[in-house]
C-alpha cells in the first residue's frame, strides 16, 4: 500500500510487474494506478493478443504517437501468455520508449516472463487476503447492494472460491435471487472454515 501511495502522490511510476494467483486484484490495481495519475493509457489483454506482430504494432503505435498527456502507460494484462519472441520484442520496445512510456505487466506465473523484462521492472507479488477478510469484503458488498444473506452461505461461497476473490464475488452474484443470497442445501462446507467465517461476521457490528 505504501508503494502505491508514493506512486499516486508523485504522479509517476516505474515499469511494474504484478504477479500472483488469479483473481487477487492485479488488473484492478493496474487500472487504479493509471486512473489516478496524469497519463494516457492503453490496455492490452495479452492472453488474446500475444503474437510478435500484435504486440509490436499496438505498443509501437501507441507509444510513438503524440498524446494528450506527458506520460503514457501500457497495461499488458496476463502477459505470461505472450510468446518468448513477442517478449523479446517487448523488451526492446520498453527500452526504446522508456522516456515517455511506462509498462505495467500482470501475470499469474512470473517464471514465464523472460529475465530481461523482469530486470527492467519493479516486481510485486499480489497476495490474497485471508478467508476472514474475503468473507468480510463479500458481506460488505452484499449489504451495500441490499442483499439479504445468512452468514453460513457466506462461508460456503468463500470456501468454494478462495483464494480467487473474483471467483468468490462472481459465485455470490450467481446465487442472488430477488435480493436474497440462497445456497443449495446439498453444498458441503468444511466446518473449520465455516466457524472461522462465522466468528468474524458475528463481530462485524
PLM regions and their residue ranges:
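General structural signal for secondary-structure boundaries
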Residues: 1, 51, 130, 182-184, ...
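P-loop/Walker A NTP-binding region and its immediately flanking N-terminal helices
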Residues: 1-124, 132-133, 139, 143, ...
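A Lys-centered signature of the CheY-like receiver
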Residues: 127
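AAA+ P-loop NTPase domains with strong preference for DNA replication initiators
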Residues: 140-205
Amino acid at each position: 500500500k505504501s508503494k502505491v501511495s508514493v506512486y499516486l502522490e508523485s504522479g509517476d511510476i516505474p515499469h511494474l510487474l504484478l504477479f500472483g494467483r488469479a483473481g487477487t486484484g492485479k488488473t484492478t490495481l493496474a487500472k487504479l494506478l493509471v486512473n489516478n495519475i496524469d497519463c494516457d493509457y492503453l490496455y492490452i489483454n495479452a492472453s488474446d493478443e500475444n503474437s510478435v506482430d500484435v504486440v509490436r504494432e499496438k505498443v509501437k503505435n501507441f507509444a510513438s504517437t503524440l498524446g494528450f498527456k506527458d506520460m503514457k502507460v501500457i497495461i499488458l494484462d496476463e502477459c505470461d501468455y505472450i510468446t518468448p519472441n513477442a517478449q523479446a520484442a517487448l523488451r526492446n520496445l520498453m527500452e526504446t520508449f522508456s522516456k515517455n512510456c511506462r509498462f505495467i505487466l500482470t501475470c499469474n506465473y512470473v517464471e514465464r516472463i523472460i529475465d530481461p523484462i523482469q530486470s527492467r521492472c519493479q516486481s510485486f507479488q499480489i497476495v490474497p487476503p485471508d478467508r476472514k477478510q474475503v468473507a468480510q469484503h463479500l458481506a460488505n458488498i452484499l449489504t451495500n447492494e441490499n442483499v439479504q444473506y445468512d452468514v453460513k452461505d457466506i462461508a460456503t461461497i468463500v470456501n468454494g472460491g478462495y483464494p480467487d476473490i473474483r471467483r468468490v464475488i462472481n459465485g455470490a452474484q450467481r446465487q442472488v435471487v430477488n435480493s436474497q443470497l440462497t445456497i443449495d442445501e446439498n453444498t458441503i462446507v468444511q466446518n473449520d472454515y465455516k466457524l472461522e467465517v462465522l466468528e468474524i461476521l458475528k463481530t462485524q457490528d
